[in-house]
């Protein structure tokens, strides 16, 4: 029973979602030349770091989790694991993850993990989430770290491809998170968390969602235009982006139930990002040695 609780507090769903993006970044950089030992070490290292961050987040959010319907039954809220033990557990997970990335991958991968961790735990969870409407924006940077870590574990350098991945996943996080904040509006309001829908209203949030999806669309296409991914990826990226944008625009119809609309937008956001992760894993080369930007220039 205790094993289940120690697993639950690491938020396995979040770990799994992050691993899909790590795989996408790793295989994009590997271009078919896969070092399986490095691959497994990177997946395990990132899993441990993400798990650590989630446990720290659960520890920090104990007070507000009690006020939210979605989180009131979490392990630490119910006292199934003591706060002191959770801190030790989170620390051990983090140290193990950072050490594995440093020793089995490279220092860059580890430092990217450290930066993502510090932003999520130190900046977002401890301060921005509770104090600022821009908390989601800051948190999006940590959410974009896993695919970049996967990419840099192979490349051992932060190049244009890594930057594009950072942009894609950061921009994706915003509509994804805002959609959650809309259909969980009462939860965030009850916990006094200053997310955009609560502070500025759902109407303003819809405009932000639309703009971020347009930005996401441009960023996804850049992966092919810059010569990192192929045309099959491009077709899928364009298709899911246009469809997601269309769903966002549906939110402006007055007859729509905002919560139902936001939940659908949230679900499709997961489909969209996983589709891109899969496609960049398998379609990592363009047919020509030159990329499209060369021709456009």
Swiss-Prot record:
Q: Name one GO molecular function term.
A: protoheme IX farnesyltransferase activity
User: What Pfam families does the entry give?
Assistant: UbiA
Supply the EC number(s). 2.5.1.141
According to UniProt, this protein's pathway is: Porphyrin-containing compound metabolism; heme O biosynthesis; heme O from protoheme: step 1/1
> Which InterPro entries does UniProt cross-reference here?
Protohaem_IX_farnesylTrfase (IPR006369), UbiA_prenyltransferase (IPR000537), UbiA_prenylTrfase_CS (IPR030470), UbiA_sf (IPR044878)
Q: Which UniProt keywords apply?
A: Cell inner membrane, Cell membrane, Heme biosynthesis, Membrane, Transferase, Transmembrane, Transmembrane helix
Please give, as recorded in its UniProt entry, the membrane topology of this protein.
Multi-pass membrane protein
This chain belongs to the protein called Protoheme IX farnesyltransferase
Protein's organism = Sodalis glossinidius (strain morsitans)
